[in-house]
Amino acid sequence: MDITLMISAVVALAAGAVIGWLATKAHADQIRADLIEERRELDIELSAARQQLAQEAHWRSECELLNNELRSLHSINTSLEADLREVTTRLEATQQHAEDKIRQMINSEQRLSEQFENLANRIFEHSNRRVDEQNRQSLNSLLTPLREQLDGFRRQVQESFGKEAQERHTLAHEIRNLQQLNAQMAQEAINLTRALKGDNKAQGNWGEVVLARVLEASGLREGYEYETQVSIENDARSRMQPDVIVRLPQGKDVVIDAKMTLVAYERYFNAEDDYTREAALQEHIASVRNHIRLLGRKDYQQLPGLRSLDYVLMFIPVEPAFLLALDKQPELITEALKNNIMLVSPTTLLVALRTIANLWRYEHQSRNAQHIADRASKLYDKMRLFVDDMSAIGQSLDKAQDNYRQAMKKLASGRGNVLAQAEAFRGLGVEIKREINPDLAEQAVTQDEEYRLRSIPEGRQDEHYPNDERVKQQLS
């Protein structure tokens, strides 16, 4: 009985242990499954976190590149503003010099006018006041051409001064346009990589578009100071077509090429690691070097009819791409010069084109100044001839006045004058139709009688004029 109870107790105890172990195992399995599920979720979150960290690293790299380009653009903007201040200073000095010349011309014109008026007044003061209307009209016909030339000279000086004032106003407007263009170019530099993923033809068109904007902002006129896509046949009878030919004063030309490809720079800009970025950088430098050699072999300077300078401007349409290549390989400038090529970016090309535009403006001003000088020289010659003619007229008038006085003396002055003798005929009973001017005739007779009385000894006048009451009154 006791053994049976013990066995039953042992069996029950064993069964309970088995049941407990089974329950514990089931609970452990449940916990293990929960842990596995939780670990899987943690792995998913870890993978997402790693991807987010990779994206953040990429954006930090992109942000650093953009910050570098922004600092570069700020530096370029500072340099450009310094160049603008220098150009503005030179232009103001030139304008001041031109204004001084204009003031000198105006003063010279005023002095000539005053001298002419003084001369005319002196001549008119010595002229006979009884000159008839026909003589005055003759003088006016002589003075009118000179007056018209003086008025034309005054208008030309005023127009030149007004043009200078308008150019000063235009300069301030162009400076504002240049600042807006600089901001626009900076924005385009940030978005440019989206436009550089096409083929070489598309990139060449993009470069030509940027070049066209720079030319438009420079103030040069298409068809006058520059031409685009001009087709020229070389000595080998093959056609060459430079992108732009800029005309310079003194009959010179300069060629601009805008076909530089920037595919490697686009890969450099979008590279995600240093190795890829370095490889793209070397490819970009090699692309610039290859285009220098290709452009040098074209030998634009030898094209017939092209009065080109000894170098060609190789235009890189993206400012950061230009600065990156020269920063890593400064010797590219020397290599380009050996091939008669100058590397230019939008900023440096704009400064060069603005300088050319100013050269054209100074050329036009110089031609106008020469024209004014020629007109002034001709006016001076006309003035000299006019003064000589007026002097001759004055001498002729003086001589005519002397002849007039001599004739009037013979007519109505002195002893035996003509009018006195004519009046004597009238006293003898000669019939007349109309009397001579009574005042002049009386003066002539009176002077004739005075001369006669002076020639008669005193006390014997009555013997010669016994019945002449007028003579007696004169004697009394």
UniProtKB/Swiss-Prot annotation:
Pfam families in the cross-refs: RmuC
Keywords of the record: Coiled coil, DNA recombination
Region named Disordered: 447-476
GO biological process, one term: DNA recombination
Coiled coil feature spans: 25-202
Skewed-composition ranges (Basic and acidic residues): 449-476
Keyword Nucleotide-binding: no
Function according to Swiss-Prot or TrEMBL: Involved in DNA recombination.
NCBIfam families hit by this protein: PRK10361.1
Family the UniProt entry places it in: Belongs to the RmuC family.
Name this polypeptide is given: DNA recombination protein RmuC
Organism: Salmonella typhimurium (strain LT2 / SGSC1412 / ATCC 700720)
Gene that encodes it: rmuC
